Amino acid sequence: SYPENDDFIANVSEEVTQNVLRLQHHVCLAIWCGNNENEWIWHQEQKSSYKKMPGYNIYHKVIPAILKNIDAMHPYWQSTPFGNDEDPNSFESGNTHQWNIWSRWIDYTEVVNDKSLFVTEFGFQGPANKDTFEKYLPIKNRNISDQVFEHHNKQVEGPERIIKFLSAHLPIKTEWNEYLYLAQLNQAFALKTCLEYWRTNKKTNGSIIWQINDCWPVSSWAIVDSDTK
């Protein structure tokens, strides 16, 4: 959430204007989006309408007014996820972020219960490649329960999630090399399962994976590690 005083709105307006003029001619640009998950998190945590959210006018009035004047060609979406329902992450309209799977400890096979119209964010964690880890991780730390190894997963209970979902589908190996391979394989199975389900579900018009890459050697949602492997 952000303030809506005159000075801050003026600063936002200038920043939006400069960046729209800078980026609007890129051929890969499909849509402008006001924010990431602000309305959704407000609705979840405050149990009230996102229209009461501090900063609401920035996304629903200020930014669209600027775009109308300098780039009316590209569509604008106030937030992601967002739709016409009270719940910004509803299956009934707009787009969704599917984080019941993984973040809320739900197995990826439960994707069959997802009725999204368009999934603009979903993902599943796996470790970086063995060669990438070996560049920074001494032999003494190459253990799945080692604190240095676990430090390179920044989600709360991220390593525990990897183990839980791995145990549901593949053998649990305590040997470090085998663990890396099987955890990567399970990440691939998870993404494949979700993508194939949404491709065959006529209600779902598309899905976007979070995320393509990462900036350091880590276990994360990335499918390409920091060494581009």
Walk through the language-model features, giving the residues of each.
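Short, electropositive alpha-helical surface patch
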Residues: 51-54, 87-102
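Active-site mouth of glycoside hydrolases
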Residues: 1-75, 79-82, 86-87, 207
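Substrate-binding clefts and catalytic carboxylate motifs of secreted carbohydrate-active enzymes
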Residues: 32, 65-68, 80, 90, ...
